[in-house]
Structures are given as C-alpha cells and as structure tokens.
C-alpha cells in the first residue's frame, strides 16, 4: 500500500541496523538463538547479517528461491517458539528468543517481512506478562522505533509495513507501561536512555501521520507512555520536558517512586474483577465508576485509555458494564464538544489530546462487536440500547442543518452524530472519531465474512459502509476505507463480494484479541493482591545469561521499586506493596514441572534398561530352545538310522594309500 504523505526530517537516516550497539547484539543474539556452545557449529538456517543482505540484494532466481526456502523454515521454527497455537505457553515456547529472531527476520523484504510482523503482532497480543521478557521487549522497541524514524522517513508514500510497525510499537510500549506500574523498569535505565533519540525523532512525525489516526494514535501512545516512564525512571535524563501534569507528581513520594492512578482506572479494574468473580458488588462498583466519569477528562489520557481497555473487557461479558462504558464515553464526548463550541477562548482547557481517547474507544467498540460473549452484547455495541428503527434506517445523517443529539455511544449512534458535524474545518475529535468508526467497520465486515451466524450483523455493517462510500465526499473518510482495505491486503472491493466466501489471510490479526484481558488480569492482581500474597518473600528475579543483552556491561542489582497507588477515597488500598513478577506460585509451578520432568526422564531410563534386559533374556531363551530342539532331532535320528552324523553330512572316509 502506498499513499502520498509529507514526511518530516528525522535523525540517523542510515539504512539497516548499523550502530555499534546493534553490531554487538547481532553476535550476542545469534549465539543465543542458535542454542549452541562456542565449539559447536551454527545450524544452516540461522539468521545472519549476510543472509539478510543476500536475501534482499540477490538477482539470481535460483539463489533467491533457495534463500526463500530457508526463510520459510525459520518462519516455521519461530511459529513453534512463539506458541501461536497455544497462546504463548508450552515447553517448546521461548518468547524472548523468538521475538528477537522474528524482528531480525522482518528485515527480509517481501512476504517474509509481512509474515514476520504478523507473527510478532499476534505473539505480543496474547503473551502473558513476564519479567524475563523485558530485555527482548526493549530490543523490539528500539528496532521498531528505528524502522519508523529512519526507514519510513526516507519514503515518500505510506506503506502497509508502517501500519504494522506502529501497531507492534503500541503493544510493546503498552506492555512496558504495565511493567512500569509494577516497578520493574528501575534496572533498565540504560535501555530507556537508548530509546530517547528515536523518541525525539518520532515526536516530529505529526506532519507525516496526522491524516491517518490509525497510525497517529499508536505513535501518540508510544510518545505519551515514554514521557511518563521517562519522568519517573530517568528524571533529568529524559528528553521530554516535565511541562504537563506537574501537580500529578508533586503529591507523590518521589523517593519511593509513587505513581498516582485516577479513580476511574481503579474502579474499572474493580468492575472487571467483580465480573470475573461473579461478585454481587458489581452494581455498587459501577455506580461509583460513573460518579468518577469526569476523570476521563484528565490531561494524562493514558490512564483513561487503560481504564477504557479494562472496562471494555468487562463489557464483553456483562451488559451492565457495557452500559457504563457507553455512559462514561457519552458524557466525555458531550463535554468535549461543548467546550470546543465555546467562542470564548480564555481559560478554556486544552483538549487537543481528546481525539486519542475517542479513537481508541472506537477500536474497543469494534472488538466488543466481534468478540463479546453473547449476540446481545455484540448487537448492542453496534446499534445501542434504544433499538430505534431510525438508528437503523438513517445510518448517515445527511441533513446537517439540525444536528442530532448524542443519546448513546454505540457505533451507529456515533456514526450518525459525527457525520452530522463533519466539515472541512471541523474539530479533530469529530473527523477522527468518524474515521475510526468507518476504518474499524471495514475490518469488522472483513472479519465476519463466512460466519453464517453473524450474517445479520454483517448485513447492517455492509449497508452502513455502502452508504458511507456512496455519499461521504470527505477525503479523510474515503482514506479510512482505502487504508483499511490495503491493511487487510485484500485487492478486491469488500462492497462487491458480499455473497462470496473468501478465506482470510493466514496469520493476519485484524484486532488485538487478548492484550486487554492480559492487562485487566495483571492490574487486578496489582491493585487487589490476594491476602496470602502479603506473606510471600520479596525475592529478586534472577537474570539468565542468555537474556543478558550487553556482554560488556556489569549486571546491575535488580532492586525492585515499590510503588504507592494513591486513591484518596480508598485508604485501605492505598500504598499497596508490589511484588516481583512472576509471583511465588508461578515460580513454584515451574519448579514443580522441572521436578516432574526430571523424575519422568529417570523413569524412562529405568524402563529402557528393563526393556533391554527383557530383550536379552528373550534372545537367550530363544537360542536355548533352538539348541534343545536340535539335540532332540539328532537323538531321534540316531535311534532310527543308527547314525551320528548330521543331516546331509557325508560319513568320514579313510583314504587308502
């Protein structure tokens, strides 16, 4: 896919990974990925710098086919190490090594690059949170930032690879932010410092990506997460100036590394926990959650995004949570639009960041529409609670003289509301929300093809998209359709293949299916640790040799940072102590698995010895039986023929001289 964009100047425009830091990583990771000692030879299919250069530069068709075959073998090996079919679990899975290998393989152009990035995105989506993943996550983060800042900046057009890199970067920094909340980034300051030049360059990408919210939203999330982490972990070393949310950090204990979460995020995690545990306190929690809905208007919108992600996961299982989610966002959009409509500019809060929250909400709605537990939840996310015929009949509000009132924030209601306010100079929240809805509807329609049970839902989405395509003249919204089609790598028109069954791309993940649940589960353990967790020993996680990223650097002591989550109205849960991840029981399970495996191997050896003894005894008995049988035959022969010679044996003759 290529679309014209205006690229901004970036730093370090040399091609490939060529810095001394990456040169060292080549050597270190190749030794680790091959799994061989120094005296053993590397397998023929290991990734090398020469292999990547030959793959991209060769003109010989025969050699190109051989290299492609080798790359496909590596792809198969990586799929197994990533555990794509087992959600990243199993004895054969080693995520840090696989992530590093896949990000190297993604430098091979063509189908190998696309499949590698698809695999990496799927793995980062469903993998669990493990402290041992951090070195590999930082390496993937630096590689993605390098590609976005250097390789992408040299291109005149927008490529589908940029979209995939931005999505991967979003997942990586989302994971890093969760580790930051656990206090696990204190010993990774050098890793954070290495990201600063690339983050600085990425901060100038607004001119390149502002027309494409699906990319720009991911970029803004990366920058915001890095800014917050940098303020807390790097202090003066960060390239970001602490100009925002100074009061947010003044009321926390800087010596203890405190980070104040807002009430909305806390209650969203509590609501998710209630849904998971089928708690009768859910309604009370949701009442308090709606009471704190104004916290969604806080300038530190990263907490708001996390809150919506967690509440969206609860909404996939519970209708009351879905209603609370829609009510909170409805109030947020109404408040933002009322502020933007005020003519008085004095002392009006700056909501230039609000479009990020609105766009991510459209993604959450799309995921609910696809992956909710019941058909009622999926239908409600699309149509809403009113079930009005007008909402189904007038999908696009063509008469803009009387703008409709925003009664709820389902997909069709928001589509009607934003389309009525579209203009060339409309607010960014309006056209970004409209863009996100159309962009995600195309992907939903593509995802639902072939699913007969969802035909009614897909028919309504198809009609909506058809009207948008026919009547919407705004170039930005037309771009949403074109980019979504190109991202799906689908050369055909989705509006002309309604009755055609077409298989989806192998390994292509349209939406992130599991990361929201992983985050909700992790934050629930962080905010509401079980009572027995307070008696767990505070151990330092060990750092393995094969996960040491820098051989010339001394290992720093992994001193865990204790965060204090300040929730003023809940003193009982303030200052919750953090414990290293993974916890005691996870480690105990791993040790138990090792013990079981050890005893199983010993039992296999004993069985092999017993089998060998049995086979030897059987062979001995067989030979003895043959010997006895032969002696019996000779005895009968002697009795009948009075001969002692063996059958067919001539008697001995003395030669007469």
Swiss-Prot record:
Highest taxon listed in the record's lineage: Eukaryota
One Pfam family matching this protein: TMEM232
Membrane topology listed for this record: Multi-pass membrane protein
GO cellular component: membrane; outer dense fiber
Keywords: Cilium biogenesis/degradation, Membrane, Transmembrane, Transmembrane helix
Keyword Cell membrane: no
Transmembrane spans: 168-188, 353-373
GO biological process, one term: maintenance of protein complex location
Cellular localisation: Membrane
Function recorded in the entry: Plays a critical role for male fertility and sperm motility by regulating sperm cytoplasm removal and maintaining axoneme integrity.
Name by which UniProt lists this protein: Transmembrane protein 232
Record gene name: TMEM232
